[in-house]
């Protein structure tokens, strides 16, 4: 749905390597090959902002830049200055930012991700979040979108409204996981559960 409701000519820059759902669905939407910027293993699997700028110049159809932070599949945690660089590129070119932050509470070795909400400023953007990776409930799935600065851009606002309207008419909502979220997230034991999981990952 995220890509299917974009303007048919609009494209999203996708990191490579990438979680295949993003690249394949964006390419399917555009009926073309994905527009990719590269994550360089020599740079700790981080992108080159200059490459992103060049791709934006070469492809005026680009409407957004996707970040996956922490990254899947590389595991890289983007430093604050890299997230800020992507937001700056988006702001300078009237784009919006998509941040897949599904793993944001599952990091280790002392590394913490910079969330899009911390640096987005007045640039339109959205963060994709959910419980499926961190919840102590195998098969429990529920995701949501945090939207920033919806009113700053008319086309972005229309796109967001379309996404939300489409979700309202879908069946099979994840009702049970939704009902548990307030209780689990407010439980004093939950942060310790996450810390223990991250510590176990660090030892492996």
Annotate each language-model stretch with its function.
Residues 14, 36, 97-99, 181:
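Hydrophobic residues in well-ordered beta-strands that form the structural core
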Residues 39-112:
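Active-site phosphate-binding strand-loop segment of PLP-dependent enzymes
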Residues 18-23:
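Conserved coil-to-alpha-helix start sites within the AMP-binding
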Residues 1-11:
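Phosphate-binding glycine-rich loop
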């Amino acid at each position: 749905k995220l890509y299917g409701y974009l303007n048919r000519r609009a494209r999203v820059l996708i990191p490579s390597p990438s979680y295949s759902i993003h690249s394949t669905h964006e390419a399917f939407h555009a009926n073309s090959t994905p527009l990719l910027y590269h994550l360089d293993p020599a740079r700790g699997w981080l992108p080159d902002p200059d490459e992103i700028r060049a791709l934006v110049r070469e492809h005026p159809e680009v409407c957004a830049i996707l970040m996956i932070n922490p990254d899947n599949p590389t595991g890289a945690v983007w430093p604050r200055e890299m997230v800020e660089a992507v937001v700056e590129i988006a702001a300078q070119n009237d784009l919006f930012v998509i941040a897949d932050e599904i793993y944001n509470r599952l990091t280790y070795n002392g590394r913490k991700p910079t969330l899009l909400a911390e640096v987005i400023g007045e640039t339109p953007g959205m963060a994709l979040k959910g419980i499926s990776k961190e919840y102590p409930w195998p098969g429990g799935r529920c995701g949501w979108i945090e939207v920033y600065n919806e009113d700053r851009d008319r086309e972005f606002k229309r796109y967001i409204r379309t996404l939300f309207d489409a979700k309202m008419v879908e069946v099979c909502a994840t009702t049970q996981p939704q009902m548990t979220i307030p209780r689990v997230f407010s439980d004093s034991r939950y942060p310790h559960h996450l810390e223990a999981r991250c510590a176990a990952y660090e030892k492996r």
